[in-house]
Amino acid sequence: MIYNYPRFPGGKTKAVTLSYDDGTVHDIRFAEILNAYGLKCTFNLVGYRVANEECLTHAFIRENILGKGHEIANHGYFHRAMDTLRPIEAIRDTLDSRLTLEKTFGIIVRGMAFPDRTVNRHQKPELYKAVKSYLEDLDIAYTRCSGGIENDTFMLPEDFHNWEVTAHHNNPRLMEYADKFLEIDVDAQYRSRRMPRVFFMYGHSFEFDRDQNWDYLEAVCQKLAGREEIWYATNMEIYNYIHAYQSLVYSADGLLVYNPTLYEIWFDVDGILYHIKPGETITLRDEVHF
């Protein structure tokens, strides 16, 4: 075995995911559009707004967000920038928000987008290290970064607590990035570059209302939707699937593979596509296809 790469469910080589913040009333129209096109989004909600049903009702979130396969994630209880807080304040803000979301909707919430400003490992490495440590203690599985960092390579993150987006929807190059993403033939890449790709757009739904460009959102959805090679997933669905892939157990020679997870997992080994069911052990072919 020379190269082993994950493939998304069904053997797909690409995924599209969205991440939108704050839980404002504009999420109602936003969710309607996404649902019409079959795109999936992670809605990052502010705890105190949820507790007080300030913008969205609990019924709407249950029926039109969670009920349509989207994710809700943590965006702080008071939407406070974590780089301005003492650790104890940031921990409480994060935990209070998580507890509110979980108790209100009866689900486990392990995803997060940094509120107000990103804590990025490249820009603020020491602060990021400290923040990541207590987020892990709080069982936050991933955190989305934003704010000037673009990932137009579409690669999966090496560190899910520093998950960099492709672009904000207002980025003037967004459609260019979308075309670039769609044109990539992953399996035709050089063998050391056949990693799966993810197109990751973020923003705030109120920006479409403010800028009067809901038609632009529809144009983006039309471009990305309905493609056989793409898995439309939430942030947490991608995290969980990749975590399951990373949990596969191999024999010393790499030819026996055991799946201890509850996921059916697809992966490419030296040009051959495999899938393995939960609890299954399979034998890989001892050959290489370039």
Task: Walk through the language-model features, giving the residues of each.
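Tight coil/turn sites that cap or link beta-strands
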Residues: 272-290
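Catalytic domains of cell-wall/extracellular-matrix polysaccharide-remodeling enzymes
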Residues: 81-183, 212-216
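Structural preference for beta-strand elements that scaffold enzyme active sites
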Residues: 15-17, 40-42, 69-73, 109-111, ...
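Short, solvent-exposed loop/turn segments at secondary-structure junctions
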Residues: 23-25, 48-50, 77-80, 116-120, ...
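C-terminal domain-boundary segment and adjacent tail
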Residues: 2-10, 38, 52, 142-154, ...
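A short acidic, amphipathic alpha-helical/loop segment
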Residues: 29-33, 130, 216, 220
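Histidine/acidic residue-rich metal-binding segments in metalloenzymes
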Residues: 59-62, 181-190
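Active-site beta->alpha N-cap acidic-glycine motif
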Residues: 1-71, 78-81, 93, 99-119, ...
